């Protein structure tokens, strides 16, 4: 099963192995924390690499959940149109980027460039009667703004803390599609050799009625296609 089917993987063991690998790679770069990484304390390069948390990644540099974190004001995010955003962050294939809010994206799309009015607006001024039909809002363009993607971002921010507190058993990491909405099947992480429970949801994450035979993902696909 792919990375999107997280319940088939021993998630906690994988996270700890990734953390150990990230720590070794950070320490191997001492002094100076390695290329593309800045130290918290520029006055003591060796001390900056004494621990994994002592190094910061600059904007545009690779990052992940358990490797040196991004510098203040930056956030580790998957690349645009990344098919498996969780996997990318776990294996350190994210990028340090400046956090973008919904208002910022909306402002960019709503303001015309150079102060020029849009052709549709000019047509309305010439022919007011032709603008009677309401304009339908365009679908979500940025997958990061989907409900599942917002949920995933909040989980990733808390993931490292929960693992070290021992509270990550049965962890639920939302399974998102490319547009940031929920995939049909959602599952909790595996617990030892036992697979975590799964359930079916709609694109907004609302649980769907349980099928009588409870056949997991096949039933989710069949129900959505019917």
Curated annotation (Swiss-Prot):
Biased composition (Basic and acidic residues): 101-126
GO cellular component, one term: insulin-like growth factor binary complex
Gene3D superfamilies: 4.10.40.20, Thyroglobulin type-1 (4.10.800.10)
PTM (free text): O-glycosylated.
GO BP, one annotated term: regulation of insulin-like growth factor receptor signaling pathway
Localization (cell): Secreted
Transmembrane region(s): none
Biased composition (Polar residues): 214-226
Keyword check for Glycoprotein: yes
Occurrences of domain IGFBP N-terminal (ranges): 26-99
Disordered: annotated span: 92-148, 205-226
Keywords: Disulfide bond, Glycoprotein, Growth factor binding, Secreted, Signal
Domain annotation Thyroglobulin type-1: ranges: 145-220
A Pfam family recorded for this sequence: Thyroglobulin_1
Gene Ontology MF term list: fibronectin binding; identical protein binding; insulin-like growth factor I binding; insulin-like growth factor II binding
SMART domains assigned: IB, TY
Classification via PANTHER family: INSULIN-LIKE GROWTH FACTOR BINDING PROTEIN, INSULIN-LIKE GROWTH FACTOR-BINDING PROTEIN 6
Function: IGF-binding proteins prolong the half-life of the IGFs and have been shown to either inhibit or stimulate the growth promoting effects of the IGFs on cell culture. They alter the interaction of IGFs with their cell surface receptors. Activates the MAPK signaling pathway and induces cell migration.
Protein name (Swiss-Prot/TrEMBL): Insulin-like growth factor-binding protein 6
Gene (UniProt): Igfbp6
């Amino acid at each position: 099963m792919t990375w999107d089917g997280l319940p088939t993987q021993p998630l906690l063991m994988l996270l700890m192995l990734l953390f150990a690998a990230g720590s070794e790679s950070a320490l191997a770069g001492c002094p100076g924390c390695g290329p593309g990484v800045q130290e918290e304390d520029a006055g003591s390069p060796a001390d900056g690499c004494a621990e994994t948390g002592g190094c910061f990644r600059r904007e545009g540099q690779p990052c992940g959940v358990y490797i040196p974190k991004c510098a203040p004001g930056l956030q580790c995010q998957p690349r645009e149109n990344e098919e498996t955003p969780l996997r990318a962050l776990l294996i350190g294939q994210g990028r340090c980027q400046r956090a973008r809010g919904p208002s910022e994206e909306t402002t960019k799309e709503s303001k015309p460039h150079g102060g020029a009015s849009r052709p549709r607006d000019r047509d309305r001024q010439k022919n007011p009667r032709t603008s009677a039909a309401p304009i339908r809002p365009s679908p979500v363009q940025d997958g990061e703004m989907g409900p599942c993607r917002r949920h995933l971002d909040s989980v990733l921010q808390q993931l490292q803390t929960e693992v070290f507190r021992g509270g990550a058993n049965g962890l639920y990491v939302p399974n998102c599609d490319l547009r940031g909405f929920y995939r049909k099947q959602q599952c909790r992480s595996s617990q030892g050799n036992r697979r975590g429970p799964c359930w079916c949801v709609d694109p907004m994450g609302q649980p769907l009625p349980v099928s009588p035979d409870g056949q997991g993902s096949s039933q989710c696909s069949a129900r959505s296609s019917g």
